[in-house]
């Protein structure tokens, strides 16, 4: 149920997912071992029934189906699963998911944690991950029955609760914390006074500029187009301490769906933007050094921009 980034990282140690994502954001088997679909709308997934939860309960199709339904009711996953019409567990150890519209990439959306059937209200539901909660829930220890137990990088993770960024940075600087997550694009951007070793990993978090299409200027699509070439995305990446990648497309450059040629054609280019504004007759009509537009062909109007940061 957690929405906290740090807690989600802990969950990934305890709970495994139905599918996993490669570095290219393609789906690969997790607790679903294989899947198929003839039309992109009805999908059949095979559950790895050789796996078991930390309490010994063997994973079933009911558990997998319940986990999907639980995710559908969660604000964290509801959007990505919005097209799911029906989830059915079958006696042969498979799960059938029916969508309201075809999506050939649907398995990539199922990297959601798996819990036991009807365990959604439990404070600490059992998982199938490499680590399990200790009896006092203050640490995570290696799950002895996990297939990769002998490959665990550390024997235990000790958990501590901190309620603010200041508390986290102070604990890290004082040596109370060994690991901390920092996201420069959010309120959890951490700055440490001591030397630290940083590791980065790719996400699908997207920072973008949206236009108010109800405004008198931006309601016109051709007026919005030049602004694509005005945004210096590389500069924005630098502001995020290089913890991001620039893309003119709503797709990560590492993804197999990324179109390099199209991305290059939409890259930052002030000269192209100026020409587009000129062609649209968005020019400096009154000599004040600023461009205006003339929707009625008679009176030039100033272009006023108000930027609002929306972090949801």
Regions found by a protein language model. Name each.
Residues 5, 98-161, 166-167, 270-271, ...:
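Gly/Pro-rich hinge or "lid" segments in bacterial periplasmic/extracellular proteins
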Residues 1-39, 69:
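N-terminal lobe/hinge region of extracytoplasmic solute-binding protein
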Residues 6, 33-76, 217:
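Aromatic- and charge-enriched surface segment that lines or borders ligand/interaction sites
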Residues 25-52, 82-121:
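Surface-exposed ligand-recognition segments of extracellular binding domains, strongest
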Residues 220-312:
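Append "and occasionally in soluble cytosolic enzymes with long acidic Gly/Pro-rich linkers
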Residues 1, 42-45, 67, 95-97, ...:
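Short, well-ordered beta-strand elements
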Residues 88, 134-139, 158-215, 225-226, ...:
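Extracellular/periplasmic solute-recognition and catalytic clefts
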Residues 1-11, 31-32, 57, 105-114, ...:
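A structural "hinge/loop" feature
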């Amino acid at each position: 149920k957690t929405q906290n980034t740090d807690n989600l990282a802990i969950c990934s140690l305890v709970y495994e997912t139905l599918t996993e994502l490669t570095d290219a954001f393609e789906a690969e088997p997790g607790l679903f071992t294989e899947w198929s679909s003839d039309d992109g709308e009805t999908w059949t997934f095979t559950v790895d029934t050789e796996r078991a939860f930390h309490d010994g309960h063997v994973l079933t199709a009911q558990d997998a189906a319940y986990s999907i339904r639980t995710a559908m009711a969660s604000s964290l996953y509801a959007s990505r699963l919005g097209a799911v019409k029906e989830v059915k567990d079958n006696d042969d150890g498979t799960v059938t998911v029916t969508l309201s519209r075809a999506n050939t990439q649907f398995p990539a959306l199922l990297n959601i944690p798996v819990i036991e059937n009807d365990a959604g209200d439990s404070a600490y539901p059992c998982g199938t991950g490499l680590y399990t909660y200790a009896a006092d829930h203050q640490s995570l220890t290696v799950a002895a029955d996990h297939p990769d137990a002998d490959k665990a990088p550390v024997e235990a993770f000790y958990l501590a609760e901190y309620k603010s960024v200041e508390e986290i940075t102070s604990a890290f600087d004082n040596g109370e914390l060994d690991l901390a997550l920092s996201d420069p694009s959010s309120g959890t951007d951490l700055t440490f006074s001591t030397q630290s070793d940083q590791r980065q990993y790719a996400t699908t978090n997207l920072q973008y500029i949206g236009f108010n299409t109800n405004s008198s200027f931006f309601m016109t699509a051709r007026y919005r187009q030049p602004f694509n070439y005005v945004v210096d995305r590389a500069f924005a990446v630098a502001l995020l301490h290089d913890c991001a990648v620039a893309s003119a497309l709503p797709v990560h450059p590492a993804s197999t769906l990324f179109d390099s040629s199209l991305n290059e054609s939409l890259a930052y280019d002030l000269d192209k933007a100026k020409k587009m504004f000129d062609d649209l007759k968005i020019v400096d009509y009154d000599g004040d050094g600023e461009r205006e537009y003339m929707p009625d062909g008679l009176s030039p109007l100033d272009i006023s921009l108000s930027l609002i940061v929306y972090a949801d």
